[in-house]
């Protein structure tokens, strides 16, 4: 526990110290910044804000985790677990980096196409499964305390879980500070679970990423001086999925990650309802003012028809939802 605290402090300090230099370099080189959605007019002023800040906190968290674990952890099984989780973080970070690179440096607005991104994510998920999950012999998922054996279909579950949550966190990263603190809340919850399970290797990884993310948040809160980009959001989502698998508490991510589930569900429901009503009535109709859900809140509060919410209000609401959901999971696991 003490080692994790030290690693978290080091990660925070290095991340917070390094980020201003990254931002300054970005600005000096006049690199194109984040593009904003025209439908949310209050965001247009952010156009050109440096992005890809996830590169910094991912490098910091990975480096600190590796250095501390190599010098302090002698158990080969623990080192294998750490390397497994870090591998999926790095792989998805590279996918996100490539997507950001194409958008910003090559001026390709969509970056990777949806098919290209999905293919790379599936390839990364397969590598994670065959190199780190399959050798462990795990083929069942924990469903509210009951082990559901999936056999060979566990492979498809892992792919769905990792790809799904990486994209879900990516959708959540739409306003200042929302994704970074939402992930911190999720990681703190998994840190408690890892501590109770005596999984101090996983706890070390969690601590270093929390520290690095908080260092990043110093420059990502409103008004944001930097965004994490796909390099950060895709990697963080994959990390949460991998941690839930490593701790054998897969089901908990549906509740701990309720914000990501809500954001993704809003997009899926909007698309389905729009297509359905267009086919039935000849015109597409919407459930939400705009998706993902955080934009709906910005444009008209919970009802979508009320007063506009500020980014801080949206952040506070969704952080609160995430915190309550996380407390519910801990209560289910250790109280009830």
Curated annotation (Swiss-Prot):
Q: Where in the cell is it found?
A: Cell membrane
Which cellular component terms (GO) are annotated to the entry? plasma membrane
List the PROSITE patterns. Answer: MRAY_2
Q: Which pathway does it operate in?
A: Cell wall biogenesis; peptidoglycan biosynthesis
Q: Which CDD domains match?
A: GT_MraY
Q: What is its EC number?
A: 2.7.8.13
| Transmembrane annotation, as ranges | 3-23, 53-73, 78-98, 118-138, 143-163, 174-194, 200-220, 226-246, 254-274, 316-336
Q: Which InterPro entries match?
A: Glycosyl_transferase_4, PNAcMuramoyl-5peptid_Trfase, PNAcMuramoyl-5peptid_Trfase_CS
Query: What cofactors does this protein use?
Result: Mg(2+)
- This protein is called what? Phospho-N-acetylmuramoyl-pentapeptide-transferase
The gene name reads mraY
């Amino acid at each position: 526990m003490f080692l994790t605290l030290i690693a978290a402090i080091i990660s925070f300090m290095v991340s917070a110290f390094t980020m201003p230099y990254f931002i300054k370099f970005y600005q000096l080189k006049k690199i194109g910044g984040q593009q904003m959605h025209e439908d949310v007019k209050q965001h247009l002023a952010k156009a050109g804000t440096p992005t890809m800040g996830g590169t910094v906190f991912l490098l910091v968290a990975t480096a600190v985790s590796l250095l501390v674990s190599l010098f302090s952890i002698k158990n080969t099984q623990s080192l294998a677990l750490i390397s497994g989780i870090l591998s999926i973080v790095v792989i998805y970070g590279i996918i996100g980096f490539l997507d950001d690179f194409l958008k910003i440096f090559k001026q390709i607005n969509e970056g990777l196409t949806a098919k290209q991104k999905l293919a790379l994510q599936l390839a990364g998920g397969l590598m994670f499964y065959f190199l780190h999950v399959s050798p462990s012999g795990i083929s069942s998922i924990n469903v509210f305390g009951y082990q559901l054996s999936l056999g060979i279909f566990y492979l498809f579950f892992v792919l769905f879980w990792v790809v799904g949550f990486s994209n879900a966190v990516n959708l959540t990263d739409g306003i200042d500070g929302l994704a970074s603190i939402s992930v911190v809340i999720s990681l703190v919850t998994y840190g408690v679970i890892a501590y109770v399970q005596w999984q101090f290797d996983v706890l070390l990884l969690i601590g270093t990423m929390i520290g690095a993310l908080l260092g990043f948040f110093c420059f990502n809160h409103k008004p944001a001086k930097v965004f994490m980009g796909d390099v950060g959001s895709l990697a963080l989502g994959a990390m949460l999925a991998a941690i839930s698998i490593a701790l054998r508490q897969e089901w908990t991510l549906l509740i701990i990650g309720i914000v990501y589930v809500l954001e993704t569900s809003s997009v899926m429901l909007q698309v389905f309802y729009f297509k359905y009503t267009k086919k039935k009535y000849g015109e597409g109709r919407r459930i939400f003012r705009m998706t993902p859900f955080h934009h709906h809140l910005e444009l008209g509060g919970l009802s979508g028809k009320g007063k506009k919410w500020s980014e801080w209000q949206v952040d506070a609401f969704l952080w609160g939802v995430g915190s309550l959901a996380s407390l519910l999971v801990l209560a289910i696991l250790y109280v009830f």
